[in-house]
Amino acid sequence: MILNLHPLENLKSYISSRPPLVIFMVSVSGMAIAFLTLGYFFKMKEIKSPGMTEDWNIFLLRFNNLDLCVSENETLKHFLNETTPPESTVTSGQARSSTQTPQALEDSGPINISVAITLTLDPLKPFGGYSRNITHLSSTIFGHQIGLSGRDSHEEMNITFTLPAAWNSDDCIVHGHCEQVVFTTCMTVTAVTNVFPVTVQPPHCIPETYSNASLWYKIYTTARDSGTKNAQDYNPFWCYKGAIGKVYHALNPKLTVIVPEDDRSLINLHLMDTSYFLFVMVITMFCYAVIRGRPSKLRQSKSEFLPEKVALSDA
């Protein structure tokens, strides 16, 4: 018995007789391609972990919204180049282990964490600088000023910037005015443990050895968050005769929490298996359409209306 197949005719008749099934095949094919592409994406790209809402990149970027005012009216505090952390705080080295067990140290008091960060000081025209060597800038803020929410929004945070070199009025005298300066400072944040992220920390700096000045002078600054600029009680003379400081943190890819490679491989495997199954389903339906063609019921119904059949029935 010879089987005569007409694949193109069968395929055309299959498409014309079963359009819903054809649409289903196209949809399944699209899903298979989408799963295959998504699986390749998970395999080749590093994906940020959706379960970790805040890492150190996000935390340090919050300080970019702060404006620090260094005013001429502030008093200087002089101290020698020999400082030790207070007994009530934990040093930055101890803070590394504290982030791993935040519940155990939640009530242990504030801790110090020191990281390197960029600070720009933009003096306004009336600002004449300081005759003393300024090596430290300090400020006190609350969590809501950097966008923290919930209980953390009411937490008090002390920030101290240790400059690598002294900042004074010598350059102001040379140029006739004070120009903008950019420092890579050692920023020390003192706050309770629950304020800090529990992810991998950035490299720590040591404020006690960061500055090369022998005589240190600390000046206290006032901080203003970005939301205050749009408030009705905004004061345009907020930092008159002063210098405005801005913090800038450059994104560090090593601080972003990503999905582990094993998990990404498992996700890729599941997506690949699903796409292969869908492809097999589509290929099976396509082969059936090529071989079977138009449904048998339709062929029988048409054959009943052939002229020969009608003539025989009349006879």
Curated annotation (Swiss-Prot):
The chain crosses the membrane at residues 22-42, 180-200, 271-291. One of its GO terms (cellular component) is membrane. It comes from the Eukaryota. The keyword Flavoprotein does not apply. The keyword Secreted does not apply. InterPro entries: TMEM248/TMEM219, TMEM248/TMEM219_dom. Keywords: Membrane, Transmembrane, Transmembrane helix. Pfam families: TMEM219. It is a multi-pass membrane protein. Its main location: membrane. It is found in: Membrane. Residues 82-103 have a biased composition (Polar residues). Residues 82-106 are annotated as: Disordered. Belongs to the TMEM248 family. This is Transmembrane protein 248. It comes from Xenopus laevis (African clawed frog).
